[in-house]
Amino acid sequence: MKITTFLSLFFLLNSLLPLSAQEQSSLSSQTLLLTGQGSPVLIGGQYKLVEEAAIAFENMTQAAAQDSIIILAVSSYRGFDRQLAIWNRKFTKNETIGLTPYQNIKKIIEYSTIPGTSRHHWGTDIDLISAEPKVEGDVLQAHLFENEGPYADLKKWMDKHANSFGFHLVYTKEDKRKGFQYEPWHYSYLPTSKKYLEWYLNLELESILKDENILGNEYFTEEFIQHYLEEYILGISANLLVQMKK
């Protein structure tokens, strides 16, 4: 089934179901949680994840260490305000080099999400590198994980073992995948994030993206939002899409 068809059926079925006052209150809390504005219960040391994801991550890092792979988390839970700061900093910087608003937005969403739409808001997703060898500068670059790069051994280990711990690569190198660029460092704890994505698709995305604090929000037209939903929020690995529909 095409993504657009799946989404149409999803929204139609959910729109036909009346919500009680309790369900509406729960939905409001759910919206805050999914958009990085809630107060999720997070655990972890130099990372923060929801409990079930954190336990699985600890188990995975221990298994990797036995194979001399030292996994280091460089980003995990990220709230709305943090994502807003990242977005606005990039938007302002791009303005100084002369990009038009549309060029600016397109450039930012090569790798960064619009605040309120990041999977990092859920406490299920984490960016990983290897603690050794040490790398100076920007460590989240795809070439560092490929061929003979410093994180190539980590990638090989994750390719072989990560799924067995529930972690799946989100933005894979697939020709048919659209949206965000390839990110060999970004993993999601599927047992929980699958459920969260299903919930997220029931939110009113336009009201989230129209936050006046988000620079450039006036260019988030209805057409853009639909495009962003289908190609970016749902521009994830084919495996994750299949799991979502089960």
Task: Describe these PLM feature segments.
Residues P18-K246:
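Extracytoplasmic cell-surface/polysaccharide-interacting catalytic and binding patches
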Residues T4-N14:
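Sec-dependent N-terminal signal peptides
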